Amino acid sequence: MQVTVNLDYKNYIFDLYGTIIDIHTEEGERKLWKALAKYYRKHGAFYFACGIRRGYHKFVNEELKKSEEIQVEKVFKKLFEVKGVDADDTLVAETCRYFRDTSTYHLRLYEWSLPILQKLKENGKKVYLLSNAQRSFTYHEMEKLDIVKYFDKIYISSDYGVKKPNPKFFQILMEKVGVDAKESLFLGNDQTCDILGAQSVGMDTWYVHTNCSPEYTEDVKATYEFLIPETSKRN
């Protein structure tokens, strides 16, 4: 499938999951929590599946009371601490990766992702990432898919305690790299987080409706739209 993007802009700012990366994770299945409990027991923290799942959600909710975006590393570290295990940064990072890998069913690029990124770089455009995500999950996945090299700067919500559609997250990127909204195009698959969020700071927008997108509404109008035919969507 060939997808073309208007090359009249200086800056191109991408969402990640559901826009560039096609991902399916499942955190609701018992086998994930059984595996995580076993992992914690291996490192001296005794849990069964129900207990670690309950503890995980408890600590996530506690972190969300402090900030609209959390750092999931703090959650996994607390799960060790309450069992008397002093987990160092290396163990916490490994735990984050284990959780993510175990809960991921598929991770791949959409067929248009590389051609667009390559075309933008070939034409000397600035390419940035602005993603609602956890750095401990995301950077590893981007490295695995070999796409880090296409981005001039990467901004992940867990680093800043704020996320889309909050204009503050967009403004962080704009201020740090000196981006002019009028010279920028935001590309994303979520009409609220990506399109309305980018429009709130004056950016033009390119909406792509993928298998990971929330239900489409005609009430939100992007500058450009690409609606994937049902037969082209991945299952």
For each of these PLM feature ranges, what is it?
Residues M1-Y12, D22-I23, F46-Y47, T90, ...:
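Asp-based, Mg2+/Mn2+-dependent phosphohydrolase catalytic module
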Residues V3-E111, P115:
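N-terminal helical cap/lid subdomain that shapes the substrate entry/recognition surface
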